[in-house]
Swiss-Prot record:
Lineage: Bacteria, Bacillati, Mycoplasmatota, Mycoplasmoidales, Mycoplasmoidaceae
Function: Specifically methylates guanosine-37 in various tRNAs.
Gene responsible for this protein: trmD
Presence of the UniProt keyword Cytoplasm in the record: yes
Protein name: tRNA (guanine-N(1)-)-methyltransferase
Keyword field contains Zinc-finger: no
Gene Ontology molecular function terms on file: tRNA (guanine(37)-N1)-methyltransferase activity
């Protein structure tokens, strides 16, 4: 899989690409991450990529020409283009699972006051990572990169993926490790029993209860589908 990020801040991704699972995935040729600065495609004599908004208003708006030319430069017939914007559809695990099937994913990071609205004519998806505002789309891009890359076969173990949060609309069950007793807080006895059938049963109950308390929206989905 190849993922191209269009950004004004290439250096933002240097440490990300050289850390942990992402670094291993790149080294093992499981994913190719390309960072492209769309300022390099500006035809303005001063390499400007923004301008004042029509109708007035605060801030500067990203102009179409550099971004569209950058898209056309990296895009192939197998590419899917994603605009990272607070007005997009909220990102979730289902979308991550969809994105991992694409041969080439292009993520567009905004900045300043945002994009010229006409950019939507050049993208396949408009995605938001939540109801809050960031200075730019780079953090959102890294969230999507991480969540998609870890789903690529052989990046992490299948067993780890099968028991994660959001599987079947349930949060993950609580995990415990040594020591057994920490300041009076003890590991539930059932986990020490060796009875895996009972452990699996209790863990499922914990998942349901945790989801019901912390994520009522997911719990409602779970009830509808089970």
């Amino acid at each position: 899989m190849k993922i191209t990020v269009l950004s004004l801040f290439e250096n933002f991704f240097n440490e990300f690409k050289n850390t942990s699972i992402i670094k291993k995935a790149i080294a093992n040729n499981l994913v190719d991450i390309e960072i492209v600065n769309f300022r390099n495609f500006s035809k303005d004599s001063h390499n400007k990529v923004d301008d004042t908004p029509y109708g007035g208003g605060a801030g500067m708006v990203l102009t179409l020409q550099p971004i569209v030319d950058a898209i056309n430069h990296v895009k192939t017939s197998n590419s899917k283009v994603v605009l990272l914007t607070p007005s997009g559809k909220t990102y979730n695990q289902q979308i991550a699972n969809q994105f991992k099937t694409f041969e080439h994913l292009i993520l567009i990071c905004g900045h300043y006051e945002g994009f010229d609205e006409r950019i939507i004519n050049y993208v396949d998806y408009e995605i938001s990572i939540g109801d809050y505002i960031l200075t730019g789309g780079e953090i959102a891009a890294m969230a999507i990169l991480d969540s998609v890359i870890r789903l690529i076969p052989n990046v992490i173990s299948v067993n780890s993926l099968e028991s994660e949060s959001f599987d079947n609309n349930l949060l993950d069950y609580p995990n415990y490790t040594k020591p057994y007793n920490f300041n009076g807080y003890k590991v539930p006895e059932v986990l020490l029993s060796g009875n895996h059938k009972e452990i699996n049963k209790v863990r499922k109950e914990w998942q349901i209860n945790k989801t019901k308390i912390n994520r009522k929206d997911l719990f409602i989905k779970y009830l509808k589908e089970n």
